């Protein structure tokens, strides 16, 4: 590693350069160095990072490479844990830790992030790096300001990466003590205070036990309030305190301990809102988010009337989910806040997070949490305001007043306490309809459509048979013509809600069926969407809204109506083709390329829905036109996109074997997608599409060698997402089945891959998360399924190519059965089926591996899943078959 040390600076700069080719060369060079000797590589980078005489840019790059190597490479993480000695790790850690004494702030910060990255993968930190926390907590009191700041900052980063399983309460005590004692000290600079508050925001997640103790809780909260009082005019400090309260109140358990501090927290929130709402909207919004955190917690609690298991980090604590009514205590102040700060949105901020929208969300929470008397008075005031402003459709002031009333009323509509709301709505529903029809005030149209959206979502039965036709005609007529994003989204989502509620599109028997209105809905959606596609002048969002509504129609419609929808979609295809041929001209005319691409993607999403639901096979000529368009889009965009892959996948499932000629043309694009490892979503869509194409066509279209090579590359690549690897393994089984005994030439590399993958998940230790457990379960299931496919392919006892692998296959199955930590019924069911198949082929020969005692224990394990419920008939039948094999062979 001597020569790499000489030019590592140059390689680091090359890997971060502007030129793509040079950058790729640099990244590959770094990768090669890491693969040759990871320990030496990290030591060199640590030495660069700690060297004060080095160029700061080089030092920062070295920190980034260390961090990314450990956080984002599964292979390097594994080597760190299993191949690098404790002495080598300690040397690397010491180099990084020493960098916290750097005179340069950005270098200290980068060192802190590297330390936290090591803490994330090297747990429990008190065992793997026992000197770290004592060093940081001691240096938090260091007289050297730079050392003090870097220690506090790093404590925060470390706490961000830790959870309740990776640190004990004694060390949390030490961290909290270092932060709080520093906070209490009067001589700290503002810079130190800001760093302490930031670190405390991360550490508070771990301080459950500290908060349960009343004395400690008082010290923590009072120290925060004292800082707030001292720095009440300093926006930076106030912002950090607000963020700390938001973090604290987002953790369910803390809600149960804030009663004595609640009004003080609210006083802080209302105070900074009033002070900064005109001059600092960001800070004012933080104040409202503190209030929202309390309301969100209480709304979640009204859905529980039992002791609920709440998770903090990865630690489990049983908490009383009682709603303590904090929100109701401040309802008068909230009502005043709402009345003064809700404003009609303008075009620039209507869908953004702003003070008015935050107040509307607070109103929604208040309508669910405030006592009935409070809300009854609020609704009475709204009713009176409606009466004052319900005359005249030409007075813009009256219309805008009504628009604000509808915004307020719509925000109150929720699944609880709707009696008063329903009365107001019933007496004013036709006024709301009129406000949607009028064309003087767009804000009024939008707020009225917002009311309709909320009603169709929460109380759709309000539109009974007498109103259903009117609302459908109104919505579909407006959808036909509108080009406003928000308004269109409200209308289309309202229509989708009605389709889902009244979507009895297969019969006209129900008086509340949408079936009589199907033609109106579809035709109006088509006219509007056709204009979008033809002109590409609307925002892609309006087209998406229309397409999503057509998609909902597909899901809830009968077969004959799906046929009508398919005819509409064919017409869309003609329009898409036409615009595709004129894209360059349209772009020159000023139409945004991304808008064009988005609408194309939405169209393919619609195709996917149709092909998934449509029972009649798509004709080959229509399918070929879809393919031609797909290929044209691929070539023009110089890439493949997920939605097109998934649409082709759905088309293959619809067409079955008749899809073969298209599959042959489509395959190169599938392969391209799969190999695009840097985009896991695209790679996944390619894998899914390949699987469905092979299953549908039931052939490998003379591409078996290429397919197997691609799938093996997917499984061994470090760049590929774990879930994509399980899909690749499952595809191998299907390829084998359709290739038949000719697959024998691939059996050795495939079995090597499967047995290598099979080792994953064993000896994981105790520090594994739920996500990893679920992945290993899926992986094992897919490996077993692939073994089953191979067994079905080579099912001749004589000269069976699997004979030499039989013992290893069975050992894997036994390991899965014995591993109770990572096990489920689906895995056991697939094992049972495979064992029966193997008995069927090998008979007494297989009995040498699977003896009667083992089989009896396996059966008992499966039966344990059905102690309190009836056994699945398939499992019951397979158990009897397994028993019969032993009877026959005795």
Q: Where do the PLM segments sit?
A:
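Karyopherin-beta/Importin-beta family HEAT-repeat alpha-solenoid scaffold
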Residues: 1-890
């Amino acid at each position: 590693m001597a020569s790499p040390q000489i030019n590592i600076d140059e390689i680091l700069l090359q890997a971060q350069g502007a030129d793509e080719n040079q950058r790729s060369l640099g990244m590959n060079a770094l990768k090669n160095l890491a693969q040759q000797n990871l320990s030496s590589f990290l030591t060199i980078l640590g030495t660069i990072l700690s060297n004060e005489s080095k160029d700061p840019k080089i030092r920062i790059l070295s920190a980034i490479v260390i961090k990314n190597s450990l956080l984002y490479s599964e292979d390097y993480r594994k080597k760190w844990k299993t191949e690098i000695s404790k002495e080598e790790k300690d040397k690397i850690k010491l180099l990084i830790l020493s960098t916290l004494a750097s005179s340069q702030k950005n270098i200290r910060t980068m060192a802190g992030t590297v330390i936290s990255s090591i803490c994330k993968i090297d747990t429990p930190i008190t065992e793997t790096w026992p000197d770290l926390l004592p060093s940081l907590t001691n240096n938090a009191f260091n007289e050297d300001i730079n050392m003090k700041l870097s220690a506090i900052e790093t404590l925060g980063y470390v706490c961000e990466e830790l959870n309740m399983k990776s640190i004990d309460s004694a060390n949390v005590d030490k961290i909290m003590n270092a932060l709080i004692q520093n906070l209490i000290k009067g001589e700290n600079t503002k810079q130190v205070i800001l760093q302490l508050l930031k670190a405390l925001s991360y550490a508070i997640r771990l301080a459950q036990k500290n908060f349960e103790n009343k004395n400690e809780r008082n010290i923590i909260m009072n120290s925060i309030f004292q800082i707030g009082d001292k720095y009440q005019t300093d926006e930076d400090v106030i912002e950090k305190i607000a963020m700390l309260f938001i973090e604290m109140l987002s953790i369910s358990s803390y809600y149960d301990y804030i009663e004595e501090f609640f009004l003080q927290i609210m006083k802080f929130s209302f105070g900074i809102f009033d002070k900064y709402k005109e001059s600092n909207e960001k800070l004012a919004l933080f104040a409202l988010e503190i209030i929202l955190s309390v309301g969100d917690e209480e709304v979640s609690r009204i859905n529980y009337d039992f002791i609920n298991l709440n998770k903090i980090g990865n630690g489990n604590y049983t908490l009383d989910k009682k709603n303590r009514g904090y929100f109701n205590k401040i309802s008068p102040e909230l009502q005043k806040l709402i009345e003064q700060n809700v404003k009609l949105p303008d075009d620039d901020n209507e869908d953004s997070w702003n003070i008015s929208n935050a107040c509307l969300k607070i109103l929604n929470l208040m309508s669910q949490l405030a006592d009935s008397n409070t809300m009854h008075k609020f609704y009475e005031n709204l009713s009176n305001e409606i009466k004052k402003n319900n005359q005249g459709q030409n007075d813009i002031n009256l219309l805008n007043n009504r628009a604000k009333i509808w915004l307020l009323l719509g925000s109150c509509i929720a699944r609880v306490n709707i009696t008063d709301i329903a009365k107001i709505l019933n007496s004013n529903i036709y006024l709301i309809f009129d406000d949607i029809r009028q064309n003087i005030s767009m804000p009024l149209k939008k707020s009225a459509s917002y009311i309709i959206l909320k009603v169709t979502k929460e109380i759709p039965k309000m539109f009974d048979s007498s109103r259903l036709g009117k609302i459908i005609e109104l919505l579909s007529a407006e959808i036909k013509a509108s080009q406003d994003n928000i308004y269109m989204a409200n209308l289309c989502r309202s229509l989708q809600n009605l389709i889902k509620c009244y979507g009895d599109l297969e019969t006209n028997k129900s008086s509340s069926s949408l079936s009589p209105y199907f033609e109106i809905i579809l035709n109006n959606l088509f006219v509007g969407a056709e204009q979008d596609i033809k002109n590409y002048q609307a925002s892609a969002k309006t087209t998406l809204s229309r397409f999503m509504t057509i998609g909902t129609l597909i899901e809830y419609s009968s077969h004959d109506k799906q046929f009508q929808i398919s005819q509409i979609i064919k017409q869309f295809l003609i329009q898409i083709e036409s615009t595709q041929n004129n894209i360059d001209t349209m772009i020159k005319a000023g139409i945004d390329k991304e808008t064009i691409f988005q609408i194309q993607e939405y169209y393919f999403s619609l195709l996917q829905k149709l092909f998934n639901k449509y029972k009649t096979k798509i004709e080959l000529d229509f399918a070929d036109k879809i393919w031609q368009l797909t290929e044209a889009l691929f070539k023009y965009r110089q890439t493949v996109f997920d939605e097109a892959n998934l649409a082709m996948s759905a088309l293959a499932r619809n067409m079955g074997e008749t899809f073969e000629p298209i599959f042959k043309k489509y395959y190169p694009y599938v392969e391209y997608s799969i190999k695009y490892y840097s985009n896991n979503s695209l790679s996944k869509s390619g894998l899914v599409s390949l699987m469905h194409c092979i299953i549908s066509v039931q052939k490998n279209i003379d591409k078996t060698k290429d397919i197997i090579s691609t799938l093996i590359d997917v499984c061994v690549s470090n760049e590929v997402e774990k879930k994509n690897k399980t899909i690749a393994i499952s595809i191998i089984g299907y390829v084998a089945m359709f290739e038949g005994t000719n697959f024998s030439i691939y059996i050795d590399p495939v079995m090597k891959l499967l047995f290598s993958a099979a080792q994953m998940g064993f000896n994981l230790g105790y520090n594994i998360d739920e996500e990893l457990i679920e992945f290993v379960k899926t992986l094992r299931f897919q490996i077993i399924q692939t073994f089953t496919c191979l067994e079905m392919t080579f099912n001749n006892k004589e000269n069976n190519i699997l004979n030499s692998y039989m013992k290893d296959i069975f050992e894997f199955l036994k390991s899965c059965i014995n591993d109770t930590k990572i096990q489920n019924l689906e895995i056991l069911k697939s094992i049972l089926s495979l064992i029966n198949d193997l008995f069927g082929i090998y008979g007494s020969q297989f009995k040498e591996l699977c003896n009667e005692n083992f089989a009896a224990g396996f059966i008992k394990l499966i039966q344990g899943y059905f102690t309190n419920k009836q056994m699945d008939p398939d499992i019951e039948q397979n158990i009897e078959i397994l028993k019969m094999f032993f009877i026959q062979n005795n």
